[in-house]
Amino acid sequence: GTIPNDSIIKSVEFLYLHDDEQTMLGGISSVDSFDGRWYVLDNSNRSKIVMYDAEGRPLNRYDRTGRGPGEYAEITDCDIDPATGRIYVLCGPPKIIILDSELNFIREIPLTQFYHRIAYDNDGILLFSGYDSAVDRMAGDGSVKRIFETAKDAYYTDSRAPVFIRSGHDIYFQTEPSDSLYRITHTGCEVAAAYDYMNREEAQARHRTESLIGLKAMEYVRPKVLCVMRDGDNLSFIYNRIVYNVSMEYNGEYHNFALNIAGLSNALAMTGNKLVGWIYSHNYDPDLAATIYDGVELHEIDDWDDAKRESGNPILVIHTLAKC
């Protein structure tokens, strides 16, 4: 069945991202926030991080391609320390660039291999490799310890889907080969939830033996967890498998419901108690939004006009969760 949006989502805000000659976005690879500001990673053409205020106006950007300190060929991923606002930027050639919350360069850390995702926790820097579905933790002294590795799989890391998911003081991660959600601990990790879905066993077998593309990939698509929520001792999570779904724990069992947040063509990311997706301005329809989010507190775009619609600028769709 379908679960009412207002049982999961408290409010929705549509935030139009303004641009200027230096901060035009081609697309959004990830979104994070700190101290009322939004940080957007754009990997569509020339990798850069752009900082916006609460009104969607650009404040600063980090755009330093090159070979020197603080420079990069591309940005793979980034994460913000929620306590300090420091930004950990995963780059290629393999290194980590550390910025302050104003996007000023602090220092960089060289890496010995390529990684696909990064997250900061109090025990170090978490690094995920999609090549071997492994998680490494880098300590403050630069030493690296592998804390998770699963069986090899025909695995592709979707650049639009999160692997590390921050929820309160916990960090979770998902890797497709195990169809499980894990919680990072001080010493390693533990299974937080294992989930089921239609054609699960066949999908697992197919992914182990071949790279699925086209219609086959659609038929055997596996869930991508986007958001983790806690209600007391119960753990729930939102995932995407063709459509958005929510899996809710009740009396030790998980029950799946469709979640009607259609119209978002791009994967969502979690920051604080907010689940953030984005659309292009020409896809924004206030009437459709009012229908989809009926019963939810809705904050639409002020002074919406044809110029904004035709600009092609991204619009953040910010879901504040009712329980998190």
Regions found by a protein language model. Give the residues of each.
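A short helix->beta-strand "capping" segment at the edge of beta-propeller domains
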Residues: 2-26
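Blade-loop segments of beta-propeller domains
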Residues: 18-23, 27, 57-84
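Repeated scaffold domains used in trafficking and secretory/extracellular systems
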Residues: 27-30, 73-78, 113-121, 155-163, ...
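Short beta-strand elements that form the blades of beta-propeller/WD-repeat-like
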Residues: 37-42, 85-91, 124-130, 166-182, ...
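Short loop/turn segments that connect beta-strands within beta-propeller blades
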Residues: 53-55, 100-104, 138-142, 184-188, ...
